[in-house]
């Protein structure tokens, strides 16, 4: 798909002219469009907040934004709001960037599964998923997928920071 121009209001606020330029800026610097609202959202009471735009998730500020804007946590990383995440779906595209991908799996899971009944193994895997996702989310990774005994996470510079590779190693 050829690169497309962004609407003029986004060109002015993001200081880029095309969708691919926006994606590059987003993936390297973070979701800059919503950062313009950080000051306003920061004045609303209540933590926890979206680490990107500072929208509150709880308390009176969170309730107010849920009612007015439908704000909720992202499915890919609950430290970010769905608005920051869904903004990108309005402008499909991408950019070639350096990022870190982490695969976490259960060593010997087949052998373990053979020694347990199905429900015990299912509970074990659910505990693995919960613990792993909790650590990865705290490191600002985006959970890409859960497959069998594996969790795949993306450490994107615009969200995990310039030290994304180090953060992935420390989280893993």
Predicted ranges, named:
Residues 92-170:
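Catalytic NTP-binding/metal-coordinating core of nucleotidyl cyclase/transferase enzymes
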Residues 1-98, 111:
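Regulatory cytosolic signal-relay segments
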């Amino acid at each position: 798909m050829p690169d497309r121009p962004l609407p003029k209001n986004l060109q002015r606020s993001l200081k880029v002219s095309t969708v691919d330029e926006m994606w590059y800026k987003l993936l390297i610097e973070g979701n800059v469009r919503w950062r313009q609202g950080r000051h306003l959202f920061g004045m609303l009471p209540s933590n926890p907040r979206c680490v990107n735009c500072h929208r509150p998730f709880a308390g009176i500020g969170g309730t107010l934004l849920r009612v007015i804007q439908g704000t909720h946590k992202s499915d890919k990383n609950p430290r970010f709001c769905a608005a920051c995440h869904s903004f990108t779906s309005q402008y499909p595209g991408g950019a070639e960037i350096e990022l870190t991908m982490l695969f976490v799996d259960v060593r010997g899971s087949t052998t373990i599964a053979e020694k347990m009944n199905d429900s015990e193994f299912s509970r074990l895997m659910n505990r693995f998923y919960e613990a792993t996702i909790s650590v990865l989310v705290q490191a600002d990774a985006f959970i890409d997928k859960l497959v069998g005994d594996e969790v795949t996470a993306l450490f994107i510079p615009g969200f995990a920071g310039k030290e994304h590779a180090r953060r992935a190693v420390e989280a893993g």
